[in-house]
Amino acid sequence: ERYLLNEVNTKIRLIRSRDNFCLMSTGQFKVKIMAASLLVRKVKVSPSVFLAHAKTLEKSLAKYPVRRVVCKTFTIPNGHLDATNEKLFTGQLPRRIVIGMVDNEAFNGAFGHNPFNFKHFSLNEIALYLDGQPHGIKPLAMNFAAHQFIHAYQGLFTGTGKENRDEGNCISRTDFENGYALYAFDLSPDLGEDDHFNLTRQGGVRVDLKFTDALPNTVTVIAYAEFENVIEIDRNRNVVFDFGL
């Protein structure tokens, strides 16, 4: 963690969800915010440190490594047995991707549906391709009807840097097939979950999905991706970044 320099113009924008998205009920209820407060911690540094920072900024920029998060969605109509998104991500390749699927009605907001109920929809194969090359030795295969999905479940640990560590993710194997079917992929070159950043790579990400049974209703696919970027600040407090890649 790094503290933000003083006198840097900072804006925070909060966008709340619709009532029919954040509430589950049988009636038409609504959320009314009566008051809200944002608490921000401020650190006061010693004068010697402040002067040292000012002197350093005369020769170089302050650099802040950040993990940028981008979420993309696409829909699969009911009755389909497979789906492909050729341009899931283009430009800078993400470090990590997590894919989940929910009912389209729940995603758009419905009081009787849970938008965080990530069903498996009888998915039997999911594959990622980077610039046309498959990620991994073979596609991730599973058979939920026979409760055979351990490789996909293990991906929640290998894809998030929790494998071989004395910590979990609060999702059990039983939970995975009952509303927590999330498919994680580590796309970093060294497959390491450390504090270091890797070299930026450019390309495109494609995803292929295959289902055992035809989809009973329209499904929304949600792709969560993490990118490694750097924010730079000069002595005049000008902020420089390039998130377009």
Can you annotate each of these PLM segments?
Residues E1-L245:
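Flexible assembly/topogenesis modules
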